[in-house]
């Protein structure tokens, strides 16, 4: 399935500039993630009072929840420059050394997808994070010698959607680690209303709530839906986004009341109709849906798990009673023993590294 999903959490190329215009610049403007925000506010103020750079920070959680935005806010609050790169973009140790040696004192270096750094590059980071220095080997053979280059004190902000893929030596070098969770409807509605004001799109409170309910707990997706609904309001309405118009537009876009699209429903229906609800292994499920296993795990599953529609068990994935009910199907009572109670499953997910 190569068609772009309107509810995909990853940004498209065309969205990257658009997102930049909507990002909050200060912590006070940032909506949601209250615990993270409060902790960061204290850490930033303490660092400012000591006249020191902030500790290295690690953000993890599903894509689209604001990790890049928080890095920008940290730099703005500290009054320093922000340098943005990603794990896949740093191919060689020399690439990272070049970035590090061009930082200024106090600067924030943001590395997205930090779990995708290759091992040689990662090892350069260890002394850079601990000692603010990099060790280079000059020359070859018997004439080779090691030279240590001092770096300015800086703050590394790492972001990952796959915390478990980070090596322990790298993870342990961060001063604080923050988990970003899916947003509730109230926070997402406030984000939609803020974006609508910036875009000068008239929207009612219940119109914003309808978009927020289908935004999958993810600001990036909610704002993307806002843009699409805006088109409907302009063409078939009077320009104002109401609840009725938002429902009409999102129904036509095949985004249901919980934000699921055709791919999500395909995964659930495949589990239910082809494998009797599971358990089924990830490789088999991927083959049956023509998706990559990693794509299912990192893109589709987090939200289905959050809703309690899907569970991971030692034997494989299973569809829950909630999934059957959402699809309008009768749940076989003889499957109850396969399920982990939802509250216990949610607790396991929140503690899952």
UniProtKB/Swiss-Prot annotation:
Domain notes: Has 3 domains, the large (RuvB-L) and small ATPase (RuvB-S) domains and the C-terminal head (RuvB-H) domain. The head domain binds DNA, while the ATPase domains jointly bind ATP, ADP or are empty depending on the state of the subunit in the translocation cycle. During a single DNA translocation step the structure of each domain remains the same, but their relative positions change.
Catalysed reaction, written as an equation: ATP + H2O = ADP + phosphate + H(+)
Binding site for DNA: 312, 317
Lineage: Bacteria, Pseudomonadati, Thermomicrobiota, Thermomicrobia, Thermomicrobiales
Functional summary from the UniProt entry: The RuvA-RuvB-RuvC complex processes Holliday junction (HJ) DNA during genetic recombination and DNA repair, while the RuvA-RuvB complex plays an important role in the rescue of blocked DNA replication forks via replication fork reversal (RFR). RuvA specifically binds to HJ cruciform DNA, conferring on it an open structure. The RuvB hexamer acts as an ATP-dependent pump, pulling dsDNA into and through the RuvAB complex. RuvB forms 2 homohexamers on either side of HJ DNA bound by 1 or 2 RuvA tetramers; 4 subunits per hexamer contact DNA at a time.
Protein family membership: Belongs to the RuvB family.
Chain residues that bind ATP: 22-23, 64, 67-69, 130-132, 173, 183, 220
Record-listed E.C. numbers: 3.6.4.-
Disulfide bonds: none
Keywords of this entry: ATP-binding, Cytoplasm, DNA damage, DNA recombination, DNA repair, DNA-binding, Hydrolase, Nucleotide-binding
Annotated GO CC locations: cytoplasm; Holliday junction resolvase complex
Residues that bind Mg(2+): 68
Gene Ontology molecular-function annotations: ATP binding; ATP hydrolysis activity; four-way junction DNA binding; four-way junction helicase activity
Cross-referenced InterPro entries: AAA+_ATPase, AAA_lid_4, DNA_helicase_Holl-junc_RuvB, P-loop_NTPase, RuvB-like_N, RuvB_C, WH-like_DNA-bd_sf, WH_DNA-bd_sf
Name under which the protein is recorded: Holliday junction branch migration complex subunit RuvB
GO biological process, one term: DNA recombination
Organism: Thermomicrobium roseum (strain ATCC 27502 / DSM 5159 / P-2)
